[in-house]
A protein has these predicted regions:
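Structural signature of hydrophobic alpha-helical transmembrane segments
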Residues: 2-14, 40, 59-73, 117-130
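N-terminal topogenic module of multi-pass integral membrane proteins
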Residues: 1-44, 48-59
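Intrinsically disordered, low-complexity non-transmembrane regions of multi-pass membrane transporters
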Residues: 1, 194-233
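Ordered, amphipathic secondary-structure segments that act as subunit-interaction surfaces
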Residues: 72-111
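Cytoplasmic-side transmembrane-helix entry/capping segments in multi-pass membrane proteins
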Residues: 33-41, 63-68, 89-100, 125, ...
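Helix-coil boundary and interhelical linker segments in multi-pass alpha-helical membrane proteins
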Residues: 1-5, 52-62, 107-121, 165-174
Length: 233
């Protein structure tokens, strides 16, 4: 795949994820340091986890100085944006997030595949690179990770990792098609509210609820109350 094209995707994903983390921090009313931490964690957390799992030195992060500076600038811009601009950004956030998911999932899968890892490791690398930063962000913000309970998200990263791990995509055109497909299906998940099956252990209000026992304390009747009031007079 053309590295210049892929770098463009990585840049867009870094901007989107850094600003997403910053917005979550501001929603939780964190200070500027908290905004900075969540922005950087969202942008680079998934890549760090991937590196640990597939044997790439974590110190390679420091060789990405341009992306780190880009993330810092993105967080700073998010922090000073007017509220009305932030509201506009959040309406298109899903698209940028889908672009970042696709770019980072493919990037992680290619890292693992080029190192000769089995398909299971390729899939894990794709998923961790694509969603790892968002999971860490939500945990640090005290939220349930949306990627695990919201519209279908991680499945598309798993799919990208599977097809790359199987060796079905070996050309630039094939990888670009995979990128477009992940973005398309992620946006379909958001638009049509596609969700994986789930089961709750909390009984619903209309389910089988055991009846509440009646109180054994006798309640005074209206006649007794009237008699008591008349004696008091």
């Amino acid at each position: 795949m053309d590295l210049h094209i892929f770098e463009v995707f990585s840049i867009i994903g870094t901007i989107a994820f850094a600003m997403s983390g910053a917005f979550v921090a501001m929603e939780e009313e964190y200070d500027i340091l908290g905004v900075l931490v969540l922005g950087l964690v969202t942008a680079f957390g998934g890549g760090i986890i991937r590196n640990v799992l597939i044997g790439i030195p974590v110190t390679t992060l420091w060789s990405q100085g341009s992306l780190i500076m880009l993330a810092l600038v993105s967080v700073a811009i998010a922090f000073i944006l007017p509220l009305k601009w932030i509201s506009h950004w959040k309406r298109t956030e899903a698209l940028f997030d889908a672009i970042g998911l696709a770019a980072f999932a493919i990037q992680g899968a290619l890292y693992a595949a080029n190192m000769g890892h089995p398909i299971s490791a390729v899939i894990v690398a794709a998923v961790m690179t694509g969603i790892g930063g968002g999971v860490i962000r939500d945990v640090l913000a005290g939220r349930k990770p949306l990627v695990l309970r919201d519209e279908i998200y991680a499945v598309w990263a798993m799919t990208a990792g599977f097809v790359i791990g199987m060796g079905w995509l070996t050309t630039n055109a094939g990888l670009l098609f995979c990128f477009a497909a992940v973005v398309f299906f992620r946006m379909c998940s958001v638009h049509y509210k596609w969700k994986l099956p789930r089961r709750s252990l909390v009984p619903s209000e209309t389910g089988n609820v055991s009846p509440q026992p009646e109180s054994i304390v006798p309640q005074p009747t209206s006649s007794v109350l009237q008699g008591t009031l008349s004696k008091g007079d």
